[in-house]
Amino acid sequence: MIRVNNVCKKYHTNSGWKTVLKNINFELQKGEKIGILGRNGAGKSTLIRLMSGVEPPTSGTIERSMSISWPLAFSGAFQGSLTGMDNLRFICRLYDVDPDYVTRFTKEFSELGDYLYEPVKKYSSGMKARLAFALSLSVEFDCYLIDEVIAVGDSRFAEKCKYELFEKRKDRSIILVSHSPSAMKSYCDNAVVLENGIMHHFEDMDKAYQYYNETQK
């Protein structure tokens, strides 16, 4: 289970402190799939970073009794001067996973070929996303964090990503952040809406859609 308790997040800006998340509360059970709807700037990606442990909350707590992925396709943690393979080996040490398996999986899944032996700073954004997604799926987690539905490379590769995540790992928990209600309907059991840093809960997904659509007017 993941429990988010009264979480707030503030950032210091040139004009003073900006509150991005305000008293966020929710729980995610094993196998549950929740969507987080919100327009750009609503705090969705910030919440994902907090849940993954990339950043701490300003106040409140996040309790984790199951393993949580880093945000899928997030390449910000890569060391640009290192090769794709060097970054892969670092992930293996960090998560104590078999480097031979991760190497085989990443080579086959990412389809990056010899670019795996080039510095990541030479990669295009799409290549970085392919590497990040392959590494994310090479390590098994109880809960996967997805910041926007798979938009990596061409449609064939995107479909391969969706199959690996939503079919082969359909027993896992998922938190899917998006501004696309259709994506939520395809992959989630229920949804919440983030609006100006405040989380709104609903009895079912249709009511969440309705509220979200009203906020877009």
UniProtKB/Swiss-Prot annotation:
Single GO cellular component term: plasma membrane
Principal subcellular localisation of the protein: membrane
Keywords: ATP-binding, Capsule biogenesis/degradation, Cell inner membrane, Cell membrane, Membrane, Nucleotide-binding, Polysaccharide transport, Sugar transport, Transport
A GO MF label: ATP hydrolysis activity
Protein residues bound to ATP: G38, R39, N40, G41, A42, G43, K44, S45
Protein location: Cell inner membrane
Residue ranges occupied by any ABC transporter domain in the UniProt entry: 2-217
Membrane topology label: Peripheral membrane protein
SUPFAM superfamilies: P-loop containing nucleoside triphosphate hydrolases (SSF52540)
GO biological process, one term: polysaccharide transport
UniProt-listed PANTHER family: TEICHOIC ACIDS EXPORT ATP-BINDING PROTEIN TAGH
UniProt family annotation: Belongs to the ABC transporter superfamily.
Name of this protein: ATP-binding protein BexA
Species annotation: Haemophilus influenzae
Organism lineage: Bacteria, Pseudomonadati, Pseudomonadota, Gammaproteobacteria, Pasteurellales
Annotated gene: bexA
